[in-house]
């Protein structure tokens, strides 16, 4: 018997993320009315803001129609428009709760939220039962290939169907689904990494391989130019749960040239805007890496609340990209400075110069390095670890609760230094010749440069308090520098 005038409330179940809602149904002499799904009220009670895009109705003409058990690659919000069902849900996601069962009855005064990967089944208990549900992805043949099934009659599940299954109407397909012991857990949504051949992209791939993470796809501009709108058509984005954007245009001086100006805006602003749009449309978490160049460097230490004030084209394009990504509901922006990773970089160059100065056969006897820009190094392996920490990975294949979405400053920890000071550390470790590094101002260093030069922030130190409050401890950049230099 349907209960009227209940308060809207939610009840957790023994399956993580599976939520039962009591709905408020208002009846009178004409019939009844209910708010079947109310985003603001229900998200306030704990319903994920799952972004439904399609509404389906299953009409069951006769009592005893039974359907399932199907785990589908989307979230569902299920209710009944008329009649009553007995529902059984089975967790078919990898993890400790795999195979866990929950059952209940639904009439128009109840609803249930079924997270992606939880198997769904029901039995109509009345003639003319209308079962209705919202989903947050459009059905496609590609999606159907990812379904996972379990047999309704599996004795291991031991579902106590009110009407014996041999008296029910089932499809031939549902009769022949595998038992739980033979069922394949539903794989999580995929993760795409863009810019995979850059310094950070290679560090992310190394982290994935080292930790045995599954479901990752790596693309660079030759396979997916994320700044080209037409190239988005090659992917079924409903299959992806996370995008990690490690791609960017980083030639800060060349960005001041006419051709560099166009390239920087394309890669650093248009590309992230396109990624943000597709991420918002498909409930994808977007990870994006920012730069200290979005600030003018007037403050000695910058935090996440500081307004943008870029000095040059590169910084302007990075700020524009940050603004676009910030409009994506599920986003992480990690702001870095002075990035060092696999490939050409400042430290590798200083090691080479130190070796030359130490070589009596080489005419080079000293080098000049800028001493009026202050900051901290960011090593790409540390940045990769921070990204996965925010996403909920804790050195295990299975993620835990991710951090709150938003912007996080992320560099190495420790005292700040100038480029000249860092160069001296490398020279001393390599050949004990740090005294051969001579300080100059930025203006002096670029005085004889013929091409365009991008303005640099004088202070690039970022406040690490916010990311440290998530439990992540950035590595001390000087210790990382010593370890890295020792490998060169």
Regions found by a protein language model. Name each.
Residues 190-211:
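N-terminal Rossmann NAD(P)H-binding glycine-rich loop of SDR-like oxidoreductase domains
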Residues 263-274, 294-344:
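Catalytic helix-loop patch of NAD(P)-dependent Rossmann-fold dehydrogenases
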Residues 386, 393-451, 483:
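Mid/C-terminal beta-alpha module of Rossmann-like enzyme folds, strongest
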